[in-house]
Amino acid sequence: METVTSLVFIVNLLIIFTSVVNQARGDTCIDGLGYCNNCDERCKAKHGPSSESSCDRSVGVPLCKCYYECESPPSPPAPPKKCDGGAGICSQRCQGQCCDMNCAQKYIGGHGFCNTLGTFSFCQCEYPC
């Protein structure tokens, strides 16, 4: 009696574990569906007509395993493109913070910095486009 109780306990744990956890092997996933009654029908109903099922008898009690094609994760969104623009000349009256403020007013989401080329200092802006 104790052996049967232990076996039932182990089988129940296995059923719970396999029904909750999907194991990914390459592009094929496995879903444990419990006992083998109507295994193929339940597999196809849950994961589509291309899924395949089998009854695993390695633990003593036949358990249904459903093999199906895993969904690929969504690709991450592309980073926003950055565009360049200008907001005039940097001077003693309008330096870094002033340039940044001018770019923010001129371009949505814009930021600016003073960029010196030779003897001239231009207010250069970067903004999402």
Swiss-Prot record:
GO cellular component terms listed in the entry, alphabetical order: extracellular region
Keywords for the protein's UniProt record, in alphabetical order: Antimicrobial, Disulfide bond, Fungicide, Plant defense, Secreted, Signal
Chief location of this protein within or outside the cell: secreted
Disulphide bond pairs: C29-C70, C36-C55, C39-C64, C43-C66, C83-C129, C94-C114, C99-C123, C103-C125
InterPro entries reported in the protein's UniProt record: LCR (IPR039641)
Keyword Ion transport listed: no
Localization per record: Secreted
GO BP terms in the entry: defense response; defense response to fungus; killing of cells of another organism
Signal sequence bounds: 1-26
Entry's family note: Belongs to the DEFL family.
Function, as annotated: Confers broad-spectrum resistance to pathogens.
PANTHER family: DEFENSIN-LIKE PROTEIN 181-RELATED, DEFENSIN-LIKE PROTEIN 183
Protein name, entry field: Defensin-like protein 182
Gene source species: Arabidopsis thaliana (Mouse-ear cress)
Designated gene of the protein: PDF3.2
